[in-house]
């Protein structure tokens, strides 16, 4: 993933002082304040990072002798820098403008204070540059738990989502789930063209937002649980005690997975509701229902 400098300019309302290479992309989510570089130290310098000059760096340059400043700025801007942002609406030294034009480097200016600008850009890039993938499935918010429903086409994922929406839960996306990893969590969202849309066989595509209200759709949700639908197989030994822990790896993060056998007569929406509440219970309780049963059996044995 990469972010163009022009997109950064638009999203942060930055003033363009020098136009640079339009093809250059931002590919790392770290920033650099070049105080050490302007002092002549270039070990471990990362020119691919966004360079931000704040009041401290600006004052340091201001106090330099003109010839020294020209020499330092010339060397600094000889590197293939992605872009340079001057914060606090400070006036750039003319050496910066001259060398930036010569080397085709973007020089931008922001009215924000330096620390806030760095914080906003870091969070912005962490989101935009997060690893992504797209999976086939349906993502719903059930009782506050983000549940990814998977399974082969035609098994009833969308119909189950529709029933959950009718019961007051919320849809994030149907059919295609865009997933990005952000700080160890998985965030699911919908492709732009299908936001709020649900495809139901026999009916067609329905606009969930229009039929069930704005509160029935969410833009994104952290994925906590996977419910995998499969056709009921009589010879399959399905988990009946909740002790068979399965996980699915998405972008290097394991997500708890439950396999739900589907056959006529089973109310799958109710099962998913129960799974969501049970998942929340497992996070809050140190004892499982199986442990409770075993404790009761031990108590009965002791009484006998």
UniProtKB/Swiss-Prot annotation:
<dbReference type="GO" id="GO:0000155">
    <property type="term" value="F:phosphorelay sensor kinase activity"/>
</dbReference>
<feature type="region of interest" description="Important for the catalytic mechanism of dephosphorylation">
    <location>
        <begin position="261"/>
        <end position="266"/>
    </location>
</feature>
<feature type="binding site">
    <location>
        <position position="158"/>
    </location>
    <ligand>
        <name>Mg(2+)</name>
    </ligand>
</feature>
<comment type="similarity">
    <text>Belongs to the HPrK/P family.</text>
</comment>
<feature type="active site">
    <location>
        <position position="240"/>
    </location>
</feature>
<dbReference type="GO" id="GO:0000287">
    <property type="term" value="F:magnesium ion binding"/>
</dbReference>
<keyword id="KW-0511">Multifunctional enzyme</keyword>
<protein>
    <recommendedName>
        <fullName>HPr kinase/phosphorylase</fullName>
        <ecNumber>2.7.11.-</ecNumber>
        <ecNumber>2.7.4.-</ecNumber>
    </recommendedName>
</protein>
<feature type="binding site">
    <location>
        <begin position="151"/>
        <end position="158"/>
    </location>
    <ligand>
        <name>ATP</name>
    </ligand>
</feature>
<dbReference type="GO" id="GO:0004674">
    <property type="term" value="F:protein serine/threonine kinase activity"/>
</dbReference>
<dbReference type="Pfam" id="PF07475">
    <property type="entry name" value="Hpr_kinase_C"/>
</dbReference>
<feature type="binding site">
    <location>
        <position position="199"/>
    </location>
    <ligand>
        <name>Mg(2+)</name>
    </ligand>
</feature>
<feature type="active site">
    <location>
        <position position="157"/>
    </location>
</feature>
<dbReference type="InterPro" id="IPR011126">
    <property type="entry name" value="Hpr_kin/Pase_Hpr_N"/>
</dbReference>
<keyword id="KW-0067">ATP-binding</keyword>
<keyword id="KW-0808">Transferase</keyword>
<dbReference type="Pfam" id="PF02603">
    <property type="entry name" value="Hpr_kinase_N"/>
</dbReference>
<keyword id="KW-0479">Metal-binding</keyword>
<keyword id="KW-0460">Magnesium</keyword>
<comment type="function">
    <text>Catalyzes the ATP- as well as the pyrophosphate-dependent phosphorylation of a specific serine residue in HPr, a phosphocarrier protein of the phosphoenolpyruvate-dependent sugar phosphotransferase system (PTS). HprK/P also catalyzes the pyrophosphate-producing, inorganic phosphate-dependent dephosphorylation (phosphorolysis) of seryl-phosphorylated HPr (P-Ser-HPr).</text>
</comment>
<keyword id="KW-0547">Nucleotide-binding</keyword>
<dbReference type="InterPro" id="IPR027417">
    <property type="entry name" value="P-loop_NTPase"/>
</dbReference>
<dbReference type="GO" id="GO:0005524">
    <property type="term" value="F:ATP binding"/>
</dbReference>
<dbReference type="InterPro" id="IPR003755">
    <property type="entry name" value="HPr(Ser)_kin/Pase"/>
</dbReference>
<comment type="subunit">
    <text>Homohexamer.</text>
</comment>
<feature type="region of interest" description="Important for the catalytic mechanism of both phosphorylation and dephosphorylation">
    <location>
        <begin position="198"/>
        <end position="207"/>
    </location>
</feature>
<feature type="active site" description="Proton acceptor; for phosphorylation activity. Proton donor; for dephosphorylation activity">
    <location>
        <position position="175"/>
    </location>
</feature>
<dbReference type="GO" id="GO:0006109">
    <property type="term" value="P:regulation of carbohydrate metabolic process"/>
</dbReference>
<dbReference type="InterPro" id="IPR028979">
    <property type="entry name" value="Ser_kin/Pase_Hpr-like_N_sf"/>
</dbReference>
<keyword id="KW-0119">Carbohydrate metabolism</keyword>
<dbReference type="GO" id="GO:0004712">
    <property type="term" value="F:protein serine/threonine/tyrosine kinase activity"/>
</dbReference>
<dbReference type="InterPro" id="IPR011104">
    <property type="entry name" value="Hpr_kin/Pase_C"/>
</dbReference>
<keyword id="KW-0723">Serine/threonine-protein kinase</keyword>
<feature type="active site">
    <location>
        <position position="136"/>
    </location>
</feature>
<keyword id="KW-0418">Kinase</keyword>
């Amino acid at each position: 993933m990469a972010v163009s400098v022009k997109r950064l300019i638009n999203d942060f309302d930055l003033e363009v002082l020098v136009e640079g290479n339009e093809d250059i992309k931002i590919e790392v989510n770290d920033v650099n304040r070049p105080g050490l570089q302007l002092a002549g130290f270039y070990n471990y310098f990362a020119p691919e990072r966004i360079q931000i000059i704040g009041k401290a760096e600006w004052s340091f340059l201001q106090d330099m002798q003109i010839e020294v400043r020209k020499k330092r700025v010339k060397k600094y801007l000889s590197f293939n820098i992605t872009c340079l942002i001057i914060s606090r609406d400070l006036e750039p030294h003319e050496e910066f403008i001259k060398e930036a034009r010569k080397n085709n480097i973007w020089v931008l200016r922001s009215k924000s204070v330096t620390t806030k600008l760095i914080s906003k850009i870091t969070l912005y890039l962490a989101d935009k540059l997060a690893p992504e993938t797209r999976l086939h499935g349906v993502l719903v918010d059930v009782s506050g738990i983000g549940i990814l429903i998977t399974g082969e086409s035609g098994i009833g994922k969308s119909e189950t989502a529709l029933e959950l929406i009718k019961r007051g839960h919320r849809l994030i996306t149907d059919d295609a789930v865009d997933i990005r990893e952000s700080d160890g969590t998985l965030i699911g969202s919908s492709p732009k063209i299908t936001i709020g849309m649900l495809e139901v066989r026999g009916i067609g595509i329905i606009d969930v937002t229009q039929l069930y209200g704005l509160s029935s759709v969410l833009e994104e949700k952290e994925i906590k649980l996977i419910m995998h639908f499969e056709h009921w197989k009589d010879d399959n030994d399905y988990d009946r005690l909740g002790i068979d822990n399965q996980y699915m790896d998405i972008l290097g993060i394991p997500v708890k997975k439950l396999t739900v056998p589907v056959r006529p007569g089973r109310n799958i929406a109710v099962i998913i509701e129960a799974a969501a509440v049970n998942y929340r219970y497992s996070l809050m309780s140190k004892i499982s229902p199986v442990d409770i049963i075993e404790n009761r059996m031990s108590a009965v044995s002791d009484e006998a």
